[in-house]
Amino acid sequence: LWTRDYAGVYEAIRGFDWSQDAK
């Protein structure tokens, strides 16, 4: 469960970072 949650959080952070980079 922890690994799954971590994966989701990592993906969310990665998406956020990508959004900032695109900006």
UniProtKB/Swiss-Prot annotation:
Protein name per the record:
COP9 signalosome complex subunit 8
Q: Which domain of life is it from?
A: Eukaryota
The record's comment on protein family reads: Belongs to the CSN8 family.
Assembly and partners are described as: Component of the CSN complex, probably composed of CSN1, CSN2, CSN3, CSN4, CSN5 (CSN5A or CSN5B), CSN6 (CSN6A or CSN6B), CSN7 and CSN8.
Q: Which gene encodes it?
A: CSN8
Q: Where in the cell is it found?
A: Cytoplasm; Nucleus
| Cytoplasm among keywords | yes
Q: Which keywords does the record carry?
A: Cytoplasm, Developmental protein, Nucleus, Phytochrome signaling pathway, Signalosome
Which BP terms from GO are recorded? red, far-red light phototransduction
Relate the protein's function as given in its record: Component of the COP9 signalosome complex (CSN), a complex involved in various cellular and developmental processes such as photomorphogenesis and auxin and jasmonate responses. The CSN complex is an essential regulator of the ubiquitin (Ubl) conjugation pathway by mediating the deneddylation of the cullin subunits of SCF-type E3 ligase complexes, leading to decrease the Ubl ligase activity of SCF. It is involved in repression of photomorphogenesis in darkness by regulating the activity of COP1-containing Ubl ligase complexes.
**For this UniProt entry, what's an example GO CC term?**
COP9 signalosome
Q: What main location does UniProt list?
A: cytoplasm
